[in-house]
A protein has these predicted regions:
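Charge-rich, low-complexity N-terminal segments
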Residues: 1-141
Length: 141
C-alpha cells in the first residue's frame, strides 16, 4: 500500500551553512533502496518534506527523522493512502524556500513569508505540486 506523508520541522542549527546537503545525500541513497520518493524544501531554518512509498518504509523513515538530532518540532501535516505517486520522479527533489517567487507564496500563505506550521497539509501538498509544475525543484536526485 502506497502512502504520502508531509511533515514540517525546524533545524536545530539553522546557521550551520547548508544542512540539507548531508540530509539529501543520505536520503537519496536510502530512499532509492527503499522505494521512497519525495521532495525536501528548506529555508529560514524550516524543513518541509513530502515522502511517498510503502506504508512501512515511510513510517520507518519518519521515525528516523523524528529522532534525528538535526530536527526539532517535527509535525505531520498530512498522511494519506494514495493510488499513485505525485513525486515519483525524485528519490529526493530539493527546493530552496528562500528563493520562492512571492506570488507563489502568497497563493498559499497569509503573508509573503511561508510558515508551513500555519497551513494545512492539503495546502502544503498544493504548494509542493505547484513547485513541481513550475520547475522550482533544483535537485532531482
Amino acid at each position: 500500500m502506497l502512502v504520502r506523508m508531509i511533515y514540517v520541522s525546524r533545524s536545530v542549527n539553522p546557521d550551520s551553512g547548508s544542512p540539507t546537503d548531508s540530509i539529501l545525500a543520505s536520503s537519496r541513497e536510502h530512499n532509492l533502496s527503499n522505494g521512497i520518493t519525495g521532495i525536501l524544501c528548506y529555508g529560514g531554518g524550516i524543513y518541509l518534506q513530502a515522502l511517498e512509498g510503502g506504508r512501512n518504509q515511510v513510517n520507518a523513515l519518519y521515525h528516523q527523522i523524528a529522532n534525528d538530532e538535526r530536527h526539532r518540532d517535527v509535525v505531520i501535516l498530512l498522511y494519506e493512502e494514495i493510488k499513485e505517486r505525485r513525486f515519483g520522479g525524485w528519490t529526493m527533489g530539493q527546493v530552496n524556500l528562500t528563493r520562492l517567487n512571492t506570488s507563489i507564496v502568497l497563493k498559499y500563505s497569509e503573508t509573503h513569508d511561508l510558515d508551513p506550521y500555519a497551513v494545512s497539509g492539503s495546502v502544503s501538498l498544493a504548494l509542493l505540486e505547484e513547485l513541481m509544475a513550475t520547475a522550482s525543484i533544483i535537485g532531482r536526485g
